[in-house]
Amino acid sequence: GFAYSDIIARYKRMKGYNVCFPAGFHASGLPAVSLAKKVERKDEGILNYLRQNGCPEDVIKKLSDPLEVVKYFSRVYVNEYWKRFGFFIDYTRLMDTISPGYKKFIQWQFYKLKEKGLLTQKPHYAPFCPNCGPVAVDKSETDISEGGDAEILEFTVIKFDFDGYILPAATLRPETIFGVTNMWVNPDVEYAIVKVGNEKWIISKEGAKKISNQIEGVEIIDSISGKELVGKKCVVPLVGREVPILPASFADPNVATGIVMSVPAHAPYDYIALKDIKADIEPIVIIEVEGYKIPAKEIVEKMGIKSQKEEEALEDATQKLYKEEFHKGILNENCMEYAGIKISEIKDAVKDDLIAKGNATIMREFSKKVVCRCGESVIIKIVPDQWFIRYSDEELTEMSKEHVESMNIFPAEYKEELPKVLDWFGDRACIRKGKWLGTEFPFKKNWIIEPISDSTLYPAYYIISKYVNEGELDAKEMDNEFFDYVFLGKGKAKNNLWEKIRNEFLYWYPVDVNLGGKEHKTVHFPVFIMNHVAIMEWKHWPKGIFVNWWITQKSGEKISKSKGGAEPIPNAAMKYGVDTMRLYYAHIASPFADIEWDDEAVEQYKKRLYKIYELQEELLKRKGGKKDIDAWLKASFNEEVRKIIEAMEKYELRRAANSIYFDIYNKFQWYIKRGGENASLIKNLLKKWICMMAPFTPHIAEEIWEKMGGDGFVSNALFPEEEEIDKDALDKEALLMKTIDDISEIIKVTKIKPSRIYIYTSPRWKWEVAKKSHELHKEGKLDMSTLMKEMMKDEEMKKHSNIPKYAQKLTKEIKKGGKHPHIDEFEYIDNAKDFISQEFNAQVFVYKGDDDAPDPGKRKELAEPLR
């Protein structure tokens, strides 16, 4: 992302814009705290990581302090990454999110949100680390090291009576309770007996730990072996049916309550498990689906599943059956008052009924394992009075969606997705309690604003950070009145500095483009927009977003410090060169596709830059004068400039890089091959080429620029402008290239090595037909009847019986975009015959189609304009 940002910033600067490219450190949250804890307990993994990345032993000792972690990595990023890569960052604006001034800035935002009624309190089931407290679980993985894409699932915990106890079975499909035939427990598990209010539950110890964080007054009072439960009976609520308790190793104590209800008519896992233990239990069908009698039985048999060990096949069967039942299923007479209701319409009716009658409650669990940065498993815990930002506010959502329509968003697909994301985006819990780095919440002591909520308006603070860094502004001066004036224009300036900062804010804002990884599509970017819309004046709402995809490992996982598996960037920069890596990032794939790190591919980009360097040295040695080929080089170069500018304006960096580092290189190679040696033209175009390289590979560009005697730094030069393109010059050389390709193809097919080559240009009558066809096409009158009438006006044309056949063919081609024949092809090919002769080591003869010329291959009559 930084490489893309830098390329865009450099390009815009070379196009004459003033560019502000600031950078900072998002130090809020758990990452620094977690790393410090690992250093404190001498975790070998983190110590080895630090040493591998060049951290001195005396510095490692200090990193048990989270603030030292922030300081150290801030220095590393600036010196080992950003400066080494030549990023065009304004270092006077560096800031971090735990500085006193930034904290004041964030608190001001929350005062504004509260003023607008966009803060609220309500109970919240939050991801919680037993060591670190509340954490955010999202794709940015700011606080966690595993499970960023986990969802919070809402299980219905149904209470089955068992000898004065409750067997709580957790399910995502409470409507299937009518088909329960038995219960599953794991005979090898020691279950806890837990007091929950006035009830005694039998639940896995892991489940007890989870439920105690979601329901008040949970107390473990005893334990019981799963073996003791097997063979006994419990009662299904609502229907009052007694069912047996059976053994199952798949009853995982780590999943929900560790107790599983069995619905073998509709759950392939349950059906095959009963078969495995040879239980004499008849499935109870509760859902009618066209084509099925006992759905689970039939899909298992159809897929040939024989055992519980076929987990992948069972999961596939489960998903297929669930999909069919959801879309086509209707509850039958076994479902009491719910009979006749479609599965797709049942929603929460059964769940609500069970809860209302005291037969069920709710339990929340992650869809997959989530691990905190500290290494502890994350659970879900109730926060009774959690504060939220009300992103569900209808007016805010609609205004944000409307603004998205006016934004420049890349890729285009994300612009289409974003309004839907904003519709879906609900209230966000915005504070946490724990050992966090961040800003104190102004309305509740000892609580910290969470990392996403403190990084929504952050670009605005870069305007202020410069004055803090230069010692002109102190955090003590930054009260709400200060921020109101600087960002909203409210009130009066207390001094000249306030006015100066306000004017600078008005000059730079709004943000033209905010770049970030794809993990922020549903995390950061929605709140970035909504907080601007909520707080800032409309003229300061952001203009653009650029989403970049990831550099991945072979496994497809994002390469990151927390994931490991990546060669340290400073080492890779030493090995390949930073310009090589910049070009690799920009060209190996679209910014909107994941890139799998490939050492061999990176090496090829290193060689490409070396080839360009060598070619430019060779070009500078040429001291000749003008030749026909000069016009083509200038025209084709100008054509590439047009393509590059068009691509850069759309942030299509790969397309621009392809033109700069491959297409232009090939054109200069062809120019040399054609004998081009115009020193003045070469120097002029080389300077432009280097200017276009500068945003992508600034170091090699500066080196060649200096070698050529360019004025100052190439980064301060202007980007080449579009110039008129000589289409005749392009068409002439394209004809020559096509002629050479055609000859090569004939030689390849015939396997004949020629000593003489005859080239014929089109006869005059074909040129006349072609010219008249294009004239009529331009006037919108081209058809066979009109064309033939026009041609027959010329007595000379009447002599050629093949005109109708050729005219018919040409009419079709022109309507498809055929080229207008406006060049003297004979003269150009004849002038190039020595070059063609050298290419094929043969004598070359060029004749006009009307000439009385030798025609040993009987090919002359086939000649047509431009082919």
Language-model segments: which ranges?
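Secondary-structure transition/capping motifs at alpha-helix termini
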Residues: 10-18, 39-49, 84-89, 116-121, ...
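Protease-associated
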Residues: 174-183, 189-259
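Acidic, turn-prone loop/beta-hairpin segments
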Residues: 26, 140-145, 627-645, 658-662, ...
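C-terminal low-complexity, glycine/proline- and small-hydrophobic-enriched intrinsically disordered tails
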Residues: 599, 603, 712-867
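N-terminal catalytic cores of NTP/NDP-binding nucleotidyl/phosphoryl-transfer enzymes
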Residues: 1-35, 106, 169-172, 176-177, ...
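Residue patterns forming the tRNA-binding/recognition surfaces of aminoacyl-tRNA synthetases
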Residues: 7, 37-178, 231-235, 241-243, ...
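Alpha-helical recognition segments enriched in aromatics with Gly/Pro capping
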Residues: 159, 170, 240-244, 248-253, ...
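Amphipathic alpha-helical
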Residues: 115, 119-142, 203-221, 693-704
